[in-house]
Amino acid sequence: APGDRTAVVAWNGFEQATVVEIPAEAELDAPVRINVANVEGTRAQHLMIRAGAFSKATVILSHAGSAQAALNQTVEVETGDSANLTVVSLQEWDDTVLHASNQRLALGRDSKLTHIVVTFGGDLVRLCADTDFRGPGAELTMLGIYFVDGGQHLEHRVFVDHSQPKCFSRVTYKGALQGKDAHSVWIGDCLIREAADGTDTYELNRNLVLTEGAKADSVPNLEIENGEIEGAGHASATGRFDDEQLFYLMSRGVPEAEARRLVVRGFFAELINQIGVPEVVDHLMATVEAELA
């Protein structure tokens, strides 16, 4: 059962669930889309995404529009044995929205899950992603991108629970902040349990503070109960806009506004190019450009 308070409220409060079932051995050419928009009142929502054994698919969960109160959401993702699933969660709300999303990820034996979180909109957005390895040999990639404007609070919490042997995980989140009282929080927890021989894991969070008055909190945590692992590490870095990079570009005739865009685009591009869903990549680059306009 969920332990986070908002997760408990969402778990107990939903009236019906939306289920996306990908049959075993199916390979879907086009992404499956789930659109959540214009929420009215305080709502608890429950979504389930299940990928059958040996299936391959991409699911895009898009949040956009306005809300008069708040959305408290549970998203369950399950990959069957040897499945290959990509889940993209886009948060592009209007500036008035409160959104808490608790995303629970379960990986079967030898399966691959790529979990991508993109947060640009909302007044307060809090997304927690918890991972449970249910069989050996599973591979997890978690990518996160967020852009925080003045007055926004965007919070991302990750928990990777390595309880099975020979599993692999990589967690990389990057964020940029601009404007007074822009605030981001990233907390990354990784636990390697005693039974998880051969674990290979690494988590990274980087933040780029573009203006005065913005604040980024970053807390990576790693707990190891097993000495027989392939590797484990974590890193966090938060820095201000690099004036030397800006000067270098401007000294070669690049206008200041364009130079700033180039630096920020370069900061995000490495991560965006790993997403592997062309329509999402193009959309994100355009959104970053709009944030900097």
What name fits each language-model region?
Residues P2-V254, F268, I272-A293:
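Conserved beta-strand/loop scaffold segments within soluble protein domains that form the structured core
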